[in-house]
Design a protein with these regions (language model features):
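Active-site-proximal or metal-binding-adjacent scaffold patches in catalytic folds
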Residues: 1-155, 164-197
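Walker B catalytic acidic pair
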Residues: 160
Length: 197
């Protein structure tokens, strides 16, 4: 993989990435308006720059849509006061870890000896997701979950627990999520009204 960063006068920093094993040029607009152009390995970076130029209108449409969605969302903000922030982090660590273990045991995310499948639970303050699960069974939860309503916290935790069995979002994952959280589609929509940025 080779990467080149260019600065576009309107779009800002653009990452051009040449990768092996891909056949088409593609553009991804990510969190905080990051833009990545993926280029097949045998193509020059100039091909990516041309593709970017041809796609400017589409990118601007996507950015406007993202801005509109962000404006409609309620941001979940952490306090700027260090003492209050420390207190929230302390409470969150205990409460989210305890609730994750409770839900794991309640819904059968356990080994044959009855212990939870979870490797470890870590709290992070990231801007891209509410939670994640690794192939080793480690669950990372966004500290801001602690500031959400309890039913949304449980939804995110259950979503990550389902990844202990299925590390993708395929049909089996969705069947399992449906079985442990029948209202997951409604809860996902409700969660999307909140922003972690």
């Amino acid at each position: 993989m080779k990467e080149k960063i260019i600065h576009h006068p309107e779009l800002g920093e653009i990452h051009l990435v040449r990768k092996r094993g891909i056949r088409r040029l593609s553009i991804k607009v990510g969190a905080e308006n990051s833009i990545r152009v993926t280029i097949p390995w045998l193509f020059p970076f100039a091909a990516g720059e041309l593709f970017l130029k041809q796609s400017e209108g589409k990118i601007n449409t996507i950015l406007r849509r993202m801005e509109k969605k962000a404006a409609e969302r309620t941001p979940i903000l952490l306090p700027s006061d260090p003492i209050a922030l420390r207190a929230i982090k302390k409470d969150a660590r205990k409460a989210l870890a305890t609730r994750t273990m409770e839900l794991a045991l309640l819904h059968g995310f356990v080994k044959s000896d009855g212990t939870p499948l979870i490797g470890r639970i870590a709290l992070k303050d990231n801007k891209s997701n509410w939670g994640s699960c690794s192939a080793k069974g480690n669950i990372n939860l966004n500290i801001r979950l602690h500031l959400l309503p309890p039913h949304l916290r449980d939804y995110v935790i259950l979503h990550e627990l389902c990844h202990l069995r299925h590390l993708n979002h395929g049909p089996e994952f969705h069947r399992l999520l449906e079985s442990v959280c029948p209202m997951h589609l409604t809860l996902k929509k409700e969660l999307n009204r909140f922003s972690i940025k």
